[in-house]
């Protein structure tokens, strides 16, 4: 079974079994919704158990979650630095033009058929996502995911076509 990373447990929150999660999912409200099932993986990326979300709320830069049946800090403190993953079969179908992060990360980025690099990470700083493009011999390029910049995405070909506005890439 394939699993996709949706968050990392970075700490406990209070004494009632809540955990601070650093989310790496594109649909946190949906992914951490009460009743949803996730898989827990240890620091060595080994499957530990399936868990069910009992509660979820946002707090600053974290998602605060609680697992069903684990209502005290003693139940969950051993999960610090563990990963939360979703099974591939639990991913919802997306509309045309929508993509999961795991589909975008690893794609090659081209401008005018010239390879710029590979998407290595997706940041969520505010209004739109920012793709971090790893380039050979240059600093990473921070590419906003907005229509004037991203011209096309072809998952099957592993390719993204872009037009970089003047001033966005200071290494050219």
From Swiss-Prot:
Q: Name one GO biological process term.
A: ribosomal small subunit biogenesis
Q: Quote any Pfam family the record assigns.
A: RimM
Residues covered by the PRC barrel domain:
96-168
Q: Which UniProt keywords apply?
A: Chaperone, Cytoplasm, Ribosome biogenesis, rRNA processing
Main location (coarse class):
cytoplasm
Molecular functions (GO terms) = ribosome binding
Q: Where in the cell is it found?
A: Cytoplasm
Spell out the GO cellular component terms annotated for this protein, sorted alphabetically and separated by semicolons.
Answer: cytoplasm; ribosome
The answer to whether the entry has keyword rRNA-binding is no
What UniProt notes about the protein's domains is: The PRC barrel domain binds ribosomal protein uS19.
Subunit structure as annotated in this protein's UniProt entry: Binds ribosomal protein uS19.
| Its job | An accessory protein needed during the final step in the assembly of 30S ribosomal subunit, possibly for assembly of the head region. Essential for efficient processing of 16S rRNA. May be needed both before and after RbfA during the maturation of 16S rRNA. It has affinity for free ribosomal 30S subunits but not for 70S ribosomes.
What family does this chain come from, according to its entry? Belongs to the RimM family.
Report the protein name in the record: Ribosome maturation factor RimM
Origin organism of this chain?
Streptococcus sanguinis (strain SK36)
């Amino acid at each position: 079974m394939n699993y996709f990373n949706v968050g990392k447990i970075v700490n406990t929150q209070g004494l009632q079994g809540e955990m601070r999660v650093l989310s790496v999912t594109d649909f946190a409200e949906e992914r951490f919704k009460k009743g949803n099932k996730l898989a827990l993986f240890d620091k060595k990326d080994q499957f530990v158990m399936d868990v069910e979300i009992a509660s979820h709320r946002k707090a600053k830069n974290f998602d605060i979650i609680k697992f069903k049946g684990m209502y005290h800090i003693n139940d969950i403190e051993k999960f610090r630095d563990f990963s939360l993953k979703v099974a591939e079969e639990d991913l919802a179908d997306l509309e045309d033009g929508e993509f999961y992060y795991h589909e975008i990360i690893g794609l090659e980025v081209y401008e005018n058929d010239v390879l710029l690099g590979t998407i290595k990470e997706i940041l969520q700083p505010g209004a739109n996502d920012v793709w971090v493009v790893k380039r050979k011999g240059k600093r990473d390029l921070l590419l906003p995911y907005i229509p004037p910049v991203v011209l096309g995405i072809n998952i099957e070909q592993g390719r993204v076509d872009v037009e970089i506005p003047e001033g966005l890439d200071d290494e050219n």
